[in-house]
Amino acid sequence: MSHALRAVFLDHASLDLGDLDMRPLHAAFDELQLHAASQPQEVAARLHGARVAISNKAPIDAQCIAARPELELILVSATGTNNIDLAAARERGIVVANCHGYGTPSVAQHTLALLLALATRLPDYQQAVRGGRWQQSSQFCLLDFPIVELEGKTLGLLGHGELGGAVARLAEAFGMRVLLGQLPGRPARADRLPLGELLPRVDALTLHCPLTEDTRGMLGAAELALMKPGAFLVNTARGGLVDEQALADALRGGHLGGAATDVLSVEPPRNGNPLLAPDIPRLIVTPHNAWGSREARQRIVGQLAENAEAWKAGRALRVVNAG
């Protein structure tokens, strides 16, 4: 087996749109082969002869790992590692390292942009102008949709890590009061309110937590009914945190003031989704691109290169399967 350090990026088009400086990543390896995307059945063959695999969402399962004895390092160009069989990699002595913190400014600004769009009814007013309603108004302005001022309102956060903290700071800059919620399955903390106490108290709720067995479906019909009438919900975390049919029903029924989500339970939603129905009012759906600024994607390139260089030097950096 050659000792040349050959790497294969299985789905680089999920990261680089031709606008990034990829030189740091190329410099980390003797050879870097790029594939725009890889289907599950293509992964093992494409990793033939590679000591390093790079993947965003392309699956590297136990069968693939067993078929590629030359594989030594898996770099994930994202935070989530659900597409990697971590146990199989650990058993084989393969290091798995991810990226994190790269999208905090971008996701935080996207979260606030969605909240502001809900509060100002921005999509409705834009559609009204395009439809000629302002042009036909008897007044100089159009006030057909109620506008909510965020100053003095209460924002609830579910998840208060780096990203939740960034959103809290932005919300406070708008004059909002911030309350923190207790996540299911986590030890109780004095500064966290149980979900049943948090939901009736907040004017808006934003989600910034991982999807686990404890958090899956944590906002269902019963929880949404606990929220204040007219409250806003913004999800830039994971689609599975929210019962999507229950959310669609809550919006159709008029209980919530609006909702916005950057994530769905299955992505892309090739077979449809309850939240893509055309009759749901006051709903904004964006295509899981809150993280996708050029600046954030360039940070991923840097972290991938850093992780590779650390591994070459015998150091662990952002390793997720140690032990």
Regions found by a protein language model. Name each.
Residues 1-50, 312:
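N-terminal glycine-/charge-rich "phosphate-binding" loop or analogous flexible N-terminal tail
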Residues 36, 77-78, 94-105, 182, ...:
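Short beta->alpha connector loops at strand-helix junctions that form conserved
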Residues 60-66, 177-179, 183-274:
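Rossmann-like adenosine-cofactor binding region
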Residues 92, 100-154:
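Phosphate-binding beta-alpha-beta segment of Rossmann-like dinucleotide-binding domains, i.e.
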